[in-house]
């Protein structure tokens, strides 16, 4: 059974990591990041739910005999 030649694996793995590192650096360098982000307040409009617009009866809980 022939032996598997693993002498080039280290070079392949190292070159793969280097290539991935360069690719990710190029991708990240294209993004624009804001240096001083400020909060923007958005006005939220309150939507009325159906039970807020209608009158509903509120019942007392049933009285249990003591």
UniProtKB/Swiss-Prot annotation:
Membrane topology: Single-pass membrane protein
A GO molecular-function descriptor: proton transmembrane transporter activity
Transmembrane spans: 8-24
InterPro entries: ATP8_mammal, ATP8_metazoa
Pfam families given in the database record: ATP-synt_8
UniProt modified residues of type N6-succinyllysine: 54
Main localization category: mitochondrion
GO terms of biological process kind: proton motive force-driven ATP synthesis
Protein family according to the UniProt entry: Belongs to the ATPase protein 8 family.
Record text on subunit structure and interactions: F-type ATPases have 2 components, CF(1) - the catalytic core - and CF(0) - the membrane proton channel. Component of an ATP synthase complex composed of ATP5PB, ATP5MC1, ATP5F1E, ATP5PD, ATP5ME, ATP5PF, ATP5MF, MT-ATP6, MT-ATP8, ATP5F1A, ATP5F1B, ATP5F1D, ATP5F1C, ATP5PO, ATP5MG, ATP5MK and ATP5MJ. Interacts with PRICKLE3.
Designated name of the protein: ATP synthase protein 8
The species this protein was found in: Cervus elaphus hippelaphus
Lineage, opening ranks: Eukaryota, Metazoa, Chordata, Craniata, Vertebrata
């Amino acid at each position: 059974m022939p032996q598997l030649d693993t002498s080039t694996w280290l070079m392949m793995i190292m070159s793969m990591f280097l290539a991935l590192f360069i690719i990710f650096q190029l991708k990240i360098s294209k993004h624009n990041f804001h240096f001083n982000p400020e909060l923007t307040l958005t006005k939220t409009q309150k939507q009325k739910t159906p039970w807020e617009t209608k009158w509903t009866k509120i019942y007392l809980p049933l009285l249990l005999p003591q």
